[in-house]
């Protein structure tokens, strides 16, 4: 055979090898060895047992029971009954090969009155100790959130909850008890979950507890001021965070090897018109309010200048002492990333209808000026997949906050269930598999190509659960929960995918490394001869046969075009996502 023929054959083999190596899907071994993979939950959405074990009502108990029409006529009295079933659910986490479980502590279960002077509920303490021990016994690390929107209703009745500065010292006491009781076994802590969502949805839009807003914004709101209350609540939330961190760093059980941070919920924003300076600046303002409003204070001790400019005198200020307490009060930042929007400059707002949502002169849109949608969505109306936004958010934090450590504390997508879909259809969640797959790809790029210091990823959520104002109609779980027939758990197809992705001993992984080493030894550009090249190719094929067989058995992905029906008509969904 002529030399030229050998040359083209070798080039063909090299091309085949390169394509095959590049086509190998990511799995847990694609990430750093100490990278944490987990799943997440919250007390109110999971536990149930609202009147058991000494627990008092929370603001969400009050909200869902007093205004049932605002939560799809659903409540979380039982939720998914995690309070009684946690041992079985932890077994499912272990089967999924999860490293960690993020959950929140119910303030009302630990200190029913909300005030330490009235005593600590020993039964509540024991429940969380038992939960922690069960996790550790299954080699799952607990990650505890102090506050996931469910403070005792008694504090709301007494002084308005987070509308009052009194909440700060009560939260400090609650946090201190948590550190003293659980700090010897829990090393990962977060203070406040999604302060942006809590304040905006609860006090500007009024569609989440405490359900306050201006009457013209939402006629269901009984009281509130959408113009001022979000800033007040957010301010007290930040001070409560700082107080908790101060206690954390004084506590002997947590001060040496524990870490603590705040959890934010940023969307990514692209300019509505890519050539418009106004829209580019609008996107920057949107990010400043979504991220900087809460991250700047816990890093630098003060609000961003752009937030001060647009919020004006409605934005409270920190004292010198408060600023000092806030500065560097987050060892890491937790990010709950779900979706993205286009941002358009809003030149005029109605002075007769002031509210937080319009203060920064930004209008959120699902489509840009040419009609291009931000990403595939479904008939849920509030989540549209935009995985590249995750990478951009991580780089935004890297560039503006000195590449501080990041944990993805929530990421997931829901399936809308109006009661007409059979279980057999819902468990075929190929769209969820593709959602996680594409977000892992962008996360991997952020870490490997961009150098972002991301240290963990928690999927939302293990189980379908009570999804706030959506009740049980928005299913985020990897496991289907039958809310009609005894809360039985059924694995969705995404469970099978996650088991493969998180497998701790993957057949063929070492072979991949061996192939890469062989390629380097051969120069990967030229081979000594066709015989060696062909032998190498045959070796590669043999070593990866098991992986190819497994790939052939994977679910086919019909996302995004066939499984998602885009909801074109909703530009500003009321939901927090």
UniProtKB/Swiss-Prot annotation:
InterPro entries: Glyco_hydro_1, Glyco_hydro_1_N_CS, Glycoside_hydrolase_SF
Keywords, sorted A to Z: Disulfide bond, Glycoprotein, Glycosidase, Hydrolase, Signal
Entry's EC annotation: 3.2.1.21
Domain of life the protein comes from: Eukaryota
Single annotated GO MF: beta-glucosidase activity
Family: Belongs to the glycosyl hydrolase 1 family.
Protein name, entry field: Beta-glucosidase 30
Organism: Arabidopsis thaliana (Mouse-ear cress)
Gene: BGLU30
